């Protein structure tokens, strides 16, 4: 966790001509996070929310139409990540997506006594580039799926 009070104390020590060391501040990460928050604010939080929901809905519908059923039950489906069943080890591992230039995440065990041959895969729908280009994002996935399946 980032203890901002501690960093305030570090800064104040320097301002008073002193010295203090706690750890290396993750300034690059904080600056990038700030920039992403500003970009989201400029896009509009309501627009971002609507685009994320539309993207999640469309990707889930595309996967379902392609034969990949959602692991999450209706009403419990997150708009930012889609987890689907597969029986193909190369889809589960992401290998077939990688050949198409897409990165996905392998599925993880549900830890609820699923059978040993249980397989799933996850598609993360993160990033403002995807929210700014929902149609393009879905189209690229659709094209890749047409070659994978």
Language-model features, listed with the residues they occupy:
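Active-site C-terminal subdomain of aminotransferase-like
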Residues: 1-61, 129
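Flexible, glycine/charged-enriched surface loops at secondary-structure junctions
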Residues: 44-51, 68-74, 149
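Alpha-helical structural signal in soluble globular domains
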Residues: 58, 62-66, 144
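Conserved C-terminal alpha-helix-loop-beta "cap" of PLP-dependent enzymes
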Residues: 64, 68-136
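Short amphipathic C-terminal alpha-helix that caps PH/PH-like domains
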Residues: 137-145
């Amino acid at each position: 966790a980032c203890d901002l009070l501690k960093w305030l104390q570090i800064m104040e020590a320097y301002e008073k001509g002193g010295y203090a060391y706690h750890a290396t501040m993750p300034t690059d990460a904080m600056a990038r996070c700030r920039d992403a928050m500003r970009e989201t604010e400029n896009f509009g939080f309501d627009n971002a929310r609507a685009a994320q929901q539309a993207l999640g809905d469309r990707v889930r519908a595309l996967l379902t139409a392609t034969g990949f059923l959602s692991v999450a039950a209706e009403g419990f489906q997150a708009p930012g990540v889609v987890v689907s069943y597969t029986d193909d080890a190369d889809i589960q591992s992401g290998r077939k997506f990688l050949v198409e230039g897409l990165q996905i995440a392998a599925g993880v065990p549900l830890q609820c006594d699923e059978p040993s041959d249980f397989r799933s895969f996850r598609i993360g729908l993160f990033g403002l580039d995807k929210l700014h280009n929902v149609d393009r994002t879905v189209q690229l996935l659709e094209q890749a799926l047409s070659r994978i399946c």
